[in-house]
Regions:
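Short amphipathic alpha-helical segments
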Residues: 21-23, 76-79, 101-103, 205-206
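ATP/NTP phosphate-donor binding region
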Residues: 1-66, 73, 186
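Gly/Ser/Thr-rich active-site loops/lids in small-molecule metabolic enzymes
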Residues: 155-162, 206-228
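Short Gly/Thr/Asp-enriched flexible loops that form oxyanion-binding sites at enzyme active sites
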Residues: 71-83
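Short hydrophobic-aromatic micro-motifs
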Residues: 133-140, 145-146, 187-195, 200-202, ...
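ATP/nucleoside-binding phosphotransfer catalytic cores, i.e., glycine-rich phosphate-binding loops
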Residues: 210, 220-295
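Catalytic core of DAGKc-family lipid kinases
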Residues: 43, 81-193
Length: 295
């Protein structure tokens, strides 16, 4: 008789306004119906999450977790350097959820998300790094990214793309251009994005990019009107290819990129991190197996 897999669900009870906590019985019931008994850890702090993930990687065949992109980042940075890792399953439950699009799992409804997750297939997903920090989908330098993240969902639903205008204009007042050397080439830019993601800041900018080939792309937005804000808006509205063809951005691709800048504070998977430069970034040489509905 085939042994049932060992399964655990780790979640932050406060993320996503407590939506996961409110649906916990349903979530565990559905996971248990498919895999058998499911253990549960209710994390009390980021340190508790890190410790729980690290220990669970040694014990379980499937590690399900819930939160936002920042939670996903903490998970990949907690993974120990061992040969055999569990299959990871991500249930979106935070304020920023670009990874929900990358994996094809609903972010709008917990029960729909559970259905998507439990019908997904294991897929290889690359883990990136910048300096000593791992990331799952993006590292970027800009005054504007946080403005996009904090735009309330209610306003986005009501006003569509116009909802971002107010927050972007507020960021514009404090915006600046950065001096960045990428692979030895000097750029003066209002925004740098290093990613393997289809979606960044809730915008699909590189829909056909593969996340299991060890390849990363860097978008360097060119200077332009309104300190480059028009070029940034074009990138997020029409995507990497269109912005490159219209000469609004430069694009550098590769598994490994060398970067040098005096700017230490970067957005990494939706959270600000202090980094040291010069740094090597790109494919970490490691991938995880994650449940996904994307081909």
């Amino acid at each position: 008789m085939k042994n049932k897999p060992k399964v655990i669900f780790i979640y932050n009870p406060t993320s996503g306004r407590g939506r996961v906590e409110k649906n916990l019985d349903f979530i565990i019931g559905e996971i248990s119906a498919k895999y058998g008994m499911c253990d549960v850890i209710r994390t009390m702090s980021p340190e508790h999450l890190t410790e729980s993930v690290r220990e669970s990687c040694y014990k379980y065949d499937y590690l399900f977790f819930s939160g936002g992109d920042g939670t996903f980042n903490m998970v990949v940075n907690a993974i120990p350097d061992i040969e055999r890792l569990p299959v990871f399953g991500f249930l979106p439950g935070g304020t920023t959820n670009d990874m929900s699009y990358n994996l094809g799992i609903s972010r709008r409804n917990v029960r729909k998300g559970v259905h998507d997750l439990l019908n997904a297939e294991p897929k290889r997903y690359d883990v990136g790094y910048i300096g000593d920090t791992k990331f799952i989908y993006v590292a970027d330098l800009s005054s504007y990214i946080n403005a996009i993240h904090i735009t309330p969902k209610s306003e986005k639903k009501k006003w569509g793309p116009l909802a971002y205008v107010y927050y972007l204009l507020m960021a514009f007042a404090h915006s600046k251009e950065y001096v960045v050397y990428l692979n030895g080439v000097k750029y003066i830019t209002p925004m740098v994005i290093i990613s393997n993601s289809k979606e960044v800041a809730s915008f699909v900018i590189n829909k056909n990019h593969k996340q299991d080939e060890g390849k990363y792309y860097a978008c360097i937005v060119k200077k332009g009107p309104l300190r480059g804000l028009t070029n940034i808006a074009y990138l997020f509205a029409f995507g990497v290819k269109a912005a490159y063809l219209s000469k609004r951005i430069e694009v550098v691709e590769g598994s490994i990129l060398e970067i040098l800048t005096d700017e230490k504070s970067w957005d990494v998977d939706g959270e600000y991190v202090e980094l040291s430069f010069p740094a090597i970034c790109g494919y970490s040489g490691r991938s995880i197996t994650v449940l996904s509905n994307r081909k």
